[in-house]
Amino acid sequence: MAMGKALSVKWTREHLLIALNLYCKLPFGRFNHRNPVLIEVASKMGRTANSLVMKLCNFASLDPIHRARGVVGLKGASKQDRLVWDEFQTDTATLGLASEQLLHDIFTADDDRELDFLQRDRVRLEPVTRFAMPVGPTEVQATVRARRGQQFFRQAVLTAYDVRCCITGIAIPRLLVASHIKPWGEFPTDRLNPRNGLCLSSLHDAAFDAGLITVDDRMRVVISRELKGYLPQESLARNFLAYEGRRIRKPEKLADPDWSCLEYHRTKIFTG
């Protein structure tokens, strides 16, 4: 299909979903027409990096966290932008997966490779063995879809927390996990919802999943009696007790963790 001039390319629903996916994965400070990631994706879409940046800024103007900070974007968010944004808020599972598939397909048809944006200097195609995936009852016959959805969730959650553990501040992507607050296997509709996620180090993710730590209604770290029962241990004191009562780092986009998800974790998973 002939694209003509890049600026004349219409914003289709498919292109909007790709832009929304990028919005979830790139920090606000990287919305720049010189960003090599945006240049590469825009080229695949047949449009200019400037037009893609403008769309990302329009999505930023709809983001409640950025609105609270006074970010107003370009004040040019269209009705179509708002509809896609609102649909994403109410049906993240469907749109998250659809956007990830669209973005994947403009780069490769190889289902054994996934896109990685966390290095931020360029788009990387990584072998699937790099990506761990939670196991649930519906995944047996849908490994590609599940992996792709998990890839979206991981990159969206890590980017929302500036690729730092929200408890310790560790900023090494290989050591970070997009931890589900409500379990992956039990709540299919929240599997891809970034508000059902926390960016944690692998150690703190394991403790969170086991109910040894949680987050209270003031966003402070709570340590269980069970974990404290293993004291005294210098490593426990350094890695857990040092953060007890401290507020977790809050996300920089897409809204704070869902209160109902955190309440579920406190009442159903946390060992007390």
Residue spans for each PLM region:
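Major-groove recognition helix of helix-turn-helix-like DNA-binding domains
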Residues: R47-L62
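Short, Lys/Arg-enriched anionic-surface-contact patches
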Residues: A2-L22, V144
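Short Lys/Arg-enriched helix C-cap and helix-to-coil transition segments
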Residues: P64-V84
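Short, charged surface segments at domain edges that flank catalytic/cofactor-binding sites
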Residues: L125-R164, K182-R195
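The −1 position to Zn-ligating cysteines in a subset of zinc-ribbon hairpins
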Residues: T48, R164, V177, L200
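Short helix->loop/beta-hairpin flanking segments within DNA-binding domains
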Residues: Y23-H33
